């Protein structure tokens, strides 16, 4: 059996990287998995600097909490359905510890932030401080991420603008990693941002 061939990789154009909420969501917010462990090693070795924004963190917090609440409700439903079937067999009902989905979500959030700060040494960019006028000008001009009719990409627009301002003020460039085409297109409008598809 032949060994798999690795495609050569190009060196990074910058060591600064921003991961969109979608990247974390796609990993089910498990930032201890193998790809994130590899990222942590790159950060530890000084090859990568991870950036996030206040908006991204708020989105992750909300989504983590929603996921935990949904999972707790699903667990209750599964136990109830299982016990209905078990009644037919004469088996005793299964008891499962009641899980407070909201509390679980908050604990998951605290763990997520702990890893993000301690292991990934993430730098936070304040997107909520971007003047709204800048984003609304893009919106009214129909520029990315608002180039599609009916687009509601306001959080992404603030994020991209904040990252571009951060890069300009620090004279750096930054990869913007996302599976969201509109966010990547908006990032591509700025010389300092390098869109990268996840």
Where are the predicted features?
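Active-site-proximal, substrate-binding regions of enzyme catalytic domains
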Residues: 2-172, 181-198
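Conserved SAM-binding loop
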Residues: 176
